[in-house]
Amino acid sequence: MYLKAYYALKPWIPRNVQLMARRAWIRSKMGQYGAVWPIDDGAGAPPADWPGWPEKKRFALVLTHDVEDLRGLLRVPRLMEMEERLEFRSSYNFVPEKYKVSPDLRKTLESRGFEVGVHGLNHDGKYFNSREIFADRARRINRYLEEWNAVGFRMPAMHHRLDWFHDLNIEYDASTFDTDPFEPCPDGVGRIFPFIVSNGGNGKRYVELPYTLPQDFLVFILLRENHLETWKRKMEWVVGKGGMVLLIAHPDYMNFGETSMKIEEYPAEYYRTFLEYVRDTYRGEYWNALPREISAYIRTIDIRN
């Protein structure tokens, strides 16, 4: 009910008012959730019989980007070049019915070692209003997955119903998190390792990849932090557990200096500095894998839900 009301009213509420309201709500809840955010100690246990990461790496590093709008789409080349210079690779998730994603851009990303995924169809929040609505949208999403030769999916706003996602022709989903009580759907999966979601009815299964670092939008836009301590602290904990460090960073919110800073932006320098920190602090210790590579590995060792 809350989500339906939110999406019905959202177009009529000025964006700065939306941000002020969310910031006030988060401030009011911060003390309540201090024991489970940004670190939930109960999420750190590895799966039974966990064999570790390939090549005996200490942890996995998975960089992902959700491209929410045209502004973010136009910044993808700058972000890709930044990651290339620092010798990182990532995935880019696009919203196919919100803006046009050119075949040339997808081809460029893939040819340079990046991955392309599908990020829903739009951002109207109606995917789970009924089983019929989701089934219809799943058919359309599957067409984009096939057209793009993509194997991964992330739902807008991290909404999720893992049992319904079996309608999608995917190898992995990335619509959950270990802990994030400030999300519209705050139910975390309570783990920092990927896992397999099986459908006993028809044998279909996919790998679930929860994000394990707080999203950039929360840290830099809503909390308005101008430092990297939250990311560093959480990463140190995940690394200590040998888990998967999975980050979502949005090019929409990164300002590369081409325009004046807007209310929903932070300096792209923050992300670059974080990548340099990871490279220099954990050199040789991480497996910088694409989501599809994580999925393929988990399937080989069959880590079940």
Language model features with spans:
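Active-site beta->alpha N-cap acidic-glycine motif
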Residues: K29-E115, A157, R161, L223, ...
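Active-site-adjacent pocket scaffolds in enzyme catalytic domains
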Residues: R27-Y33, N142-G243
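Conserved, mostly hydrophobic/aromatic
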Residues: L9, D66, V116-H119, F153, ...
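Acidic-and-aromatic substrate-binding clefts and catalytic sites of carbohydrate-active enzymes
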Residues: E68-L74, N93-D104, D124-A135, G152-D163, ...
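C-terminal domain-boundary segment and adjacent tail
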Residues: G44-P47, E55, L228-N305
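Short, well-ordered coil/turn segments that N-cap beta-strands
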Residues: K57-L61, L86-S90, S111-V116, E146-V151, ...
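Membrane-proximal basic amphipathic "stem/tether" segments
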Residues: M1-W37
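Generic structural signal for well-ordered alpha-helices
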Residues: P47-A48, V76, M80, P103-K107, ...
